[in-house]
């Protein structure tokens, strides 16, 4: 029986998609982001909770009244959820059959052009209402330094989603001295504004809430002396990106 490998769940999330959301954090990720707040999700073979589709649907459906009242639903994050597409295909198909909004939060690090990947993603996309795409850095060399992987396949994937008319929110973590360069943010905005499917752009201010996990795993944390950006730096970044010619009115 097909099973998913989960790191954890959050029953009432409010930041990973619209409304109140049940969030599944999957195990396994190919990127090694310097600021990752879930480094304990990197290894897909680490001890994790194995679940069937039926088990998860039964856990999720009692929350449906909250989804309906808030415009929420289910978000699968990670880790990297696209490493477990066969499981997600079945899960999202069942959730949609029960009238639940579905969302994937991905950094697209595992995206590739193999027939197997494209076949599974095309099937998964049929049952996916929204994708949150994290673009870590628009500059390829800086992306490699930040995550350990290039960004060329990620940007290509963003264009594919645009061609598919798949609704997308794009998110960018703002790290002082790493991903806050003016010219890079302007280029990021030009790229985003060239896509036809982006409903929302969000800047996520860097934080250190996951540093203790790095220490518990015995992994050196290279950004320990980096302070989170202040509100003015975040506003300035929004102005540089200039998504659709405006900045969020809620700042």
From Swiss-Prot:
Residue numbers binding [4Fe-4S] cluster: 29, 33, 36
Radical SAM core domain boundaries: 15-244
Gene Ontology CC terms, in alphabetical order: cytoplasm
Key word Endoplasmic reticulum present: no
Main EC class the enzyme belongs to: oxidoreductase
Cross-referenced Pfam families: Fer4_12, Radical_SAM
Binding-site residues for S-adenosyl-L-methionine, renumbered to this chain: 35-37, 79, 134-136, 207
Keywords: 4Fe-4S, Carbohydrate metabolism, Cytoplasm, Glucose metabolism, Iron, Iron-sulfur, Metal-binding, Oxidoreductase, S-adenosyl-L-methionine
Primary role: Activation of pyruvate formate-lyase under anaerobic conditions by generation of an organic free radical, using S-adenosylmethionine and reduced flavodoxin as cosubstrates to produce 5'-deoxy-adenosine.
Name the record gives this protein: Pyruvate formate-lyase-activating enzyme
Organism: Staphylococcus epidermidis (strain ATCC 35984 / DSM 28319 / BCRC 17069 / CCUG 31568 / BM 3577 / RP62A)
Gene of this entry: pflA
